[in-house]
């Protein structure tokens, strides 16, 4: 039985395979349409400084950009930022940068801020930011190099140089927070919003 009551599928303004998998596993029909925005430019021009504010602003801007090309559709935007000791880390540019990220996070607790937004016809309908706290174990240089060898290009594909759903799980001693937040899409508040709009039958 289909649980979606909308007349058309959702649009996910992201190419993230993990976010796509989360929506698909939740039984939500959707199409993907990547947002054409310069994330660094949005971050610089927004004047925002906290990781949570930046995550939700980027989520909103992604959804707005795609909404401008998708009249009448519910568009989901999502973004994730990482903060460690007051410093924001961006997605690593390559292996050397990923190694630097891991050295900075080694033995410390960092926060992942996941923002999600829903926009329809250019109007912000819903936004949420959730936080998870991640404690990385002390990593030796050998461990970092072994991880980078094993992870390959995946080490540069996310802001923390790890994917918790993959080899990244080996790097942590403690995790506090919602699983979906860690994966970059606060699914529970998103589903609650869709339910409040009578778009879900469950």
Swiss-Prot record:
Nucleoside triphosphate pyrophosphatase. May have a dual role in cell division arrest and in preventing the incorporation of modified nucleotides into cellular nucleic acids. CDD domains: Maf (cd00555). Its cofactor is a divalent metal cation. It catalyses: a ribonucleoside 5'-triphosphate + H2O = a ribonucleoside 5'-phosphate + diphosphate + H(+); a 2'-deoxyribonucleoside 5'-triphosphate + H2O = a 2'-deoxyribonucleoside 5'-phosphate + diphosphate + H(+). GO terms for cellular component: cytoplasm. The active site is at residue 79. SUPFAM superfamilies: ITPase-like. GO terms for biological process: nucleotide metabolic process. The keyword Transport does not apply. InterPro entries: ITPase-like_fam, Maf-like. Keywords: Cytoplasm, Hydrolase, Nucleotide metabolism. This is Nucleoside triphosphate pyrophosphatase.
